[in-house]
Amino acid sequence: MSTPSVQTFGKKKTATAVAHVKAGKGLIKVNGAPITLVQPEILRFKVYEPLTLVGLDKFQNIDIRVKVSGGGHVSQVYAIRQAIAKGLVAYHQKFVDEASKNELKKVFASYDKTLLVADSRRMEPKKFGGRGARARFQKSYR
């Protein structure tokens, strides 16, 4: 029989990250590379947020593998952190107990709601008569 696992996803704009969480020995990989190599370096701590919020002891006995595609660098980082947080909550709900799941959800929600809930904002399409969605070209009366 295969090891018990859960699959969750995180989204930001057009970036999608799929996380597979299963029992293991504490490996966390993003697109096959360790989480310590996530680029850009400035946003690496954003990916670490779910880990630091609940403590590394919760990650000692699970492996997380994340595949991310689409979007830009920043969107991918936010999708990764959401997938990891949702994966941890789903794993605790399915294989640990309800109390620890509720505790994790409370910690994540109090820190940043987007760790568990997707940001639904999208880019507004450009219209004619201006440079962007709302900006208009300057009007001259003479």
From Swiss-Prot:
Pfam families, per the entry: Ribosomal_S9
Organism superkingdom: Eukaryota
GO CC aspect terms: cytosolic small ribosomal subunit
Family annotation (InterPro entries): Ribosomal_Su5_D2-typ_SF, Ribosomal_uS9, Ribosomal_uS9_CS, Ribsml_uS5_D2-typ_fold_subgr
Gene3D superfamilies referenced in this protein's UniProt entry, alphabetically: 3.30.230.10
Coiled coil stretches, renumbered: none
PROSITE patterns (UniProt xref): RIBOSOMAL_S9
Protein family: Belongs to the universal ribosomal protein uS9 family.
Protein name as it appears in the record: Small ribosomal subunit protein uS9
